[in-house]
Amino acid sequence: MTIEERAETASYYCQECGAAVTQAFADQIPVEAETLKKLGAGYAAGMGCMEATCGALIGAVMTAGILTDGKGTPAVSRQLVAGFQEKCGATICKDLKGIETGRVLCSCPECVRNAVLTLGEV
């Protein structure tokens, strides 16, 4: 599956942002798919309050930790944050959703898609 196909599939099934991103890479992670879904579940809506980092970005960082086997992960995380910020316009859930401005920068499915694409680029 190409990274674009992973991104489209993840964004289509975006019920919980963090879980959707981890699921997109389930075939590359030595953990049961259901466990991955549970690990990412708490990160929806900026950790449930929209005040924190987007769950999709958190899912990408968690996935990067597994894919890099923990080697060089902080550098990869920096690249993920920068790439996600560039694609989406923000990294905080309420900013992405325009809670205070009334202007949505990036929808949840697009955040998931962009997180998957960014992870595929780094």
What role is predicted for each listed range?
Residues 1-11:
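Polybasic, low-complexity association/targeting segments
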Residues 10, 14-18, 36, 70-73, ...:
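Generic structural signal for well-ordered, non-membrane alpha-helical segments
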Residues 21-41, 85-93:
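Acidic-glycine-rich active-site phosphate/pyrophosphate-binding loop
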Residues 21-25, 57-68, 115-119:
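Buried hydrophobic packing segments
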Residues 27-39, 65-79:
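Phosphate-handling active-site elements
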Residues 43-63:
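Glycine/serine-rich anion-binding loops at beta->alpha junctions
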Residues 55-56, 60, 66-68, 72, ...:
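Catalytic phosphate/nucleotide-handling subdomain of diverse soluble enzymes
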Residues 78-122:
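C-terminal binding/interaction regions
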